[in-house]
Amino acid sequence: MTSTKDKTAITPTRENDYPEWYQQVVKASDLAENSPVRGSMVIKPWGYGIWENIQRQLDDRIKETGHENAYFPLFIPLSFLEKEAAHIEGFAKECAVVTHHRLEEKDGRLIPAGPLEEPLIVRPTSETIIGDSFSRWVESYRDLPLLINQWANVVRWEMRPRIFLRTTEFLWQEGHTAHATHEEALQETMTMLEVYRSFVEDVLAIPVIVGEKSPGERFPGAENTFTLEAMMQDRKALQSCTSHYLGQNFAKGSNIRFSNMEGQLEYAYTTSWGMTTRLIGSLIMCHGDDDGLRLPPRIAHKQIVIVPVIPKPELEAQVLEYAENLAAELRKQIFYGKPLTVHIDKRDKRGGEKNWEWVKKGVPLRLEVGPRDINEQAVMVARRDQSPKNKQSLPKQQFVQQAASILEDIQRNYYVQAATYRDQHIYRHLETFEEMRAFFTPKNEEKPEIHGGFVLAKWCGDPVTEEMLSDLKVTIRCLPVKQSGTKGRCILTGREATLDAIFAKSY
């Protein structure tokens, strides 16, 4: 983190008040705002442009693995959820329930009327409603695998909302698949986990730990839940996505059966996996600095912004023509298979004001062009991965040819910076529960947000022991897929243990 002595665009800084810094970055970068409905947000064009890029690029990867998109109802009959007692237990307190189907006016006010015969649940997740369709679509092993994805909104009533991180309504994609064998379904679970990992690390430049959830953190009704865990700059964990192997549990509840190769009826093996708008919050907290958002070029929907510098009205046409020609040349350059996205800021504002707006919005490259640049056939270049004061004049043609490689360098820098920060704050030397308690106890009760980081330690695997962590507000984030295989002592009980586990506070 930068020194608080430096003048910054965002107040307070991360060090001074991390939660408020986050809220101010959301506001200053014009990503989103709160709505009249508590816990729901308005995603503004700058924020939604990021989500559209996430959608486009992730959707391509999902389809490359053989999945197709479909859409299922927002409303789920209560009876569908009652079939899955273990599943709904995890969502019951968060469900929004529709009980009436119309409004009537009474004494000048509108009141609900027309009670429904059966209450409807506003989609918290879609396993049950999609399972109902799967039960009709699957008859034979020849109908499998069934590989479906849905882009939709979800409602989970949130008592402590925070924009992008925890909202009552959020956007996501949810994949649902059915398979003939346990092996195929488990392979699907891991395949999609790898799709997520490569997307989050390669496109969003967020380093993650790939692992399996402990029983206490597992998706309700799943046999296995796999996750990607990222470290934010307050050293808390943020779950970036999950991929669930559901076994035959949901197939039995939804009666998804097929005739196998021997002609016998068998329940299908299913999976589900999802990623949400929470990723935008992860981008902010992983890459943002005390001047605002910093967008990795591969996810930025405006990779380059040109700010014309017009000292006199009579020079406006000449400067704008130079800017238009520069933009046209840049758009011919290819970055990861697509033309560079370039925007010319023609608003009637002072150059300095416009520059700082784009700094706060996180645009990877800012360019200034004015009369001097025209005379020298040059361009003034500022990179978002460097100090806003750092500007370099480059020959125009040289910059055009180097633009894509500069963006690639910025992309790489963001990943390396985040990975270095994470690795510096994973602690491997703690051995006892008392040491863990001391590690996670805030040194300053008035500012408890920024604590030590992640603890990598041995765990005995006993689900009961997870309850010991509740008063510390710590959870087992995951059991890393890459296990050391060494023996040691469980940090919670002192018993012999072989499992490596990541312990952390989280969002």
Swiss-Prot record:
Its EC number is 6.1.1.15. Coiled coil: none annotated. It is found in: Cytoplasm. It is an enzyme of class 6 (ligase). InterPro entries: aa-tRNA-synt_IIb (IPR002314), aa-tRNA-synth_II (IPR006195), aa-tRNA-synth_II/BPL/LPL (IPR045864), Anticodon-bd (IPR004154), Anticodon-bd_dom_sf (IPR036621), Pro-tRNA-ligase_IIa_arc-type (IPR004499), Pro-tRNA_ligase_II_C (IPR016061), Pro-tRNA_synth_II (IPR017449). Keywords: Aminoacyl-tRNA synthetase, ATP-binding, Cytoplasm, Ligase, Nucleotide-binding, Protein biosynthesis. Homodimer. Belongs to the class-II aminoacyl-tRNA synthetase family. ProS type 3 subfamily. NCBIfam families: proS_fam_I. PANTHER family: BIFUNCTIONAL GLUTAMATE_PROLINE--TRNA LIGASE, PROLYL-TRNA SYNTHETASE. This is Proline--tRNA ligase. It comes from Protochlamydia amoebophila (strain UWE25). The gene is proS.
